[in-house]
């Protein structure tokens, strides 16, 4: 079992029950999944770019990503239908908690000029989204072997009903919010 999973069961869940006054343990918000998404627009011109992006994502997430394809053709972007345009990974269970631990304790402090993550990126339904500008903040990526800096989107899906509950949950997981 992951370190953060133990911490959730032993400390975070009881603290949230006390703070919000839940009547049953099933009402306590928890993280259900983390989705990593990387859009690779350069893959339209060069197929090797997609292979490098998939390899980077596999190192970051610890599992093989799914290549996402264009749903319809867009002439302005030179995209045809079913053309590979990105990759994504959905993490659940132990791998999710391991990634969360590495992200909060190792990757976020490596961001240049880091002053905390935005406290406004909630979607109104208890989910949180973070945009990472470059993949080299993750320790699994070797700086010398990176062909291009690529950003990725991290979506944290929770069972929280409100943004306030979600922020309390993520703060308990030691997310460094700035506002």
From Swiss-Prot:
Keywords from the named record: Ribonucleoprotein, Ribosomal protein, RNA-binding, rRNA-binding, tRNA-binding
PANTHER family: 60S RIBOSOMAL PROTEIN L11-RELATED (PTHR11994)
Segment forming the signal sequence: none
Originating species: Polaromonas naphthalenivorans (strain CJ2)
Protein name: Large ribosomal subunit protein uL5
Protein role: This is one of the proteins that bind and probably mediate the attachment of the 5S RNA into the large ribosomal subunit, where it forms part of the central protuberance. In the 70S ribosome it contacts protein S13 of the 30S subunit (bridge B1b), connecting the 2 subunits; this bridge is implicated in subunit movement. Contacts the P site tRNA; the 5S rRNA and some of its associated proteins might help stabilize positioning of ribosome-bound tRNAs.
Assembly and binders: Part of the 50S ribosomal subunit; part of the 5S rRNA/L5/L18/L25 subcomplex. Contacts the 5S rRNA and the P site tRNA. Forms a bridge to the 30S subunit in the 70S ribosome.
Annotated GO MF terms: rRNA binding; structural constituent of ribosome; tRNA binding
Database matches in InterPro entries: Ribosomal_uL5, Ribosomal_uL5_bac-type, Ribosomal_uL5_C, Ribosomal_uL5_CS, Ribosomal_uL5_dom_sf, Ribosomal_uL5_N
A cellular component annotation (GO) from this entry: ribosome
Disulfide bonds listed in the record: none
């Amino acid at each position: 079992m992951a370190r953060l999973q133990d911490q959730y069961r032993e400390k975070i869940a009881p603290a949230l029950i006390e703070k919000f006054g839940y009547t049953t343990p099933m009402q306590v918000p928890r993280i259900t999944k983390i989705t990593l998404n990387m859009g690779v627009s350069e893959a339209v011109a060069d197929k090797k770019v997609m292979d490098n992006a998939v390899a980077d994502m596999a190192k970051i997430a610890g599992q093989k990503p799914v290549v996402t394809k264009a749903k319809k053709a867009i002439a302005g972007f030179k995209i045809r239908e079913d053309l590979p345009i990105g990759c994504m990974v959905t993490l659940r269970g132990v791998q999710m908690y391991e990634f969360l631990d590495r992200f909060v304790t190792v990757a976020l402090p490596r961001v240049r000029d880091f002053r905390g993550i935005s406290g406004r990126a909630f979607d109104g339904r208890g989910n949180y989204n973070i945009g990472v500008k470059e993949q080299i903040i993750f320790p699994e990526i070797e700086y010398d072997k990176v062909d291009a800096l690529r950003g990725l989107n991290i979506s944290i899906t929770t069972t929280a009903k409100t943004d306030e509950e979600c922020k309390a949950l993520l703060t308990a997981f030691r997310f460094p919010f700035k506002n």
